[in-house]
Amino acid sequence: GSLNDQMAKSISGAMGEVAASKFLGIKFEYHCNVGGVPDLIFKDLKLQVRTQLPKSNNKNSLIIRQKAEQNQFYILVIDEAPKFKILGFVNSTYVLGQEQWKTTFGLDRPFCYSIPPEKLTPINLLKDSTWN
């Protein structure tokens, strides 16, 4: 996309991280698009926040790439600025290697994992440490 699109996505992503950190009651670290570094740390858990604009077909999903690390927690946030909706989370360990989540979305690109919001764990269970 254009430079404006790239900047808008970076700002949206950062605001999704702010929303998640605010909900979890942790400090936002003010870094953006740093590969290999978790977006947030919560009680020694590495969190990756995925922020998306709402899709017109209501088909948002949490995207996890093939190269994701095991045991990182991925959070899906929908940017409905000024509101940001946290739809849930999943531990990458339970997604990586699972055929039912693999997709290319019909595009000529490497597959990724796509988890629908209804399959995510509610975010309040992460906050309360009661997801296990």
Annotate each PLM feature:
Residues 1-43, 50-132:
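Nucleic-acid endonuclease domains
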